[in-house]
Amino acid sequence: MLSRRALMMAGGSLALGAGSARATAIMTEDGFYREDWFLDSFLELAEDRKSVAAAGKQLAVIWEQPGCPYCRETHLVNFAQKVAETYIRDHFEVLQLNLRGSRIVTDFDGERLGENQLAHKYGVRGTPIIQFFSDKDDLAQKAPLEREVSRIPGYMPPRAFLLMFAFVAERAYERGSLRDYLRRQG
């Protein structure tokens, strides 16, 4: 759990830029920033979710596209903060997908789609978007948007970004709304 004290210290560190000197984001041949700790996957979401859950973590999917300035900001500012990186790595596996990509992904329900078709199926239209999926085994039976427990719908400043990950990691969505959670965090 991200304690109030840890959160305040993290917020101060983020505001001062502490930890921003480390950089694990690399620019790939296809124009993406990628963290060296992102999930390497065969793009089979049900299998990824199972292995992630077995490790005691949750699956997050980040949708990006080449040239996206807010995707760049997410990597070079948010993921670059040591406190955020550590928290996310401890609680999540992050799979990076291309909004306009053509790699074949097997969805939770077994449907095989190109990345761009999968994005459309989940209502992903812009970038960056981070989807957080339930760690329950019943995802194949649910409608696509009901599989998510939360979503970051675009760029968020570092403190709010970290709080979204904490909201999901603590399963606070089971006890109330994000708004209530944020109010309690101060």
What are these regions (language model features)?
Residues S41-Q58:
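A short beta-strand-turn-helix
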Residues A55-C68:
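Short active-site neighborhood of thiol/selenol oxidoreductases, capturing the structured segment around
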Residues M1-L14:
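N-terminal secretory signal peptides and thylakoid transit peptides that target proteins
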Residues R72-Y87:
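Typically the conserved alpha-helix immediately C-terminal to a functionally engaged Cys/Sec
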Residues E115-Q131:
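Structural micro-motif
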Residues T24-W37:
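N-proximal helix/coil linker or "cap" segments that precede and/or mark the start of modular domains
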Residues I88-L113:
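Thiol-based oxidoreductase modules, predominantly thioredoxin-like and allied folds used
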Residues S134-Y173:
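Non-catalytic, surface beta->alpha helical segment in thiol-disulfide oxidoreductase systems
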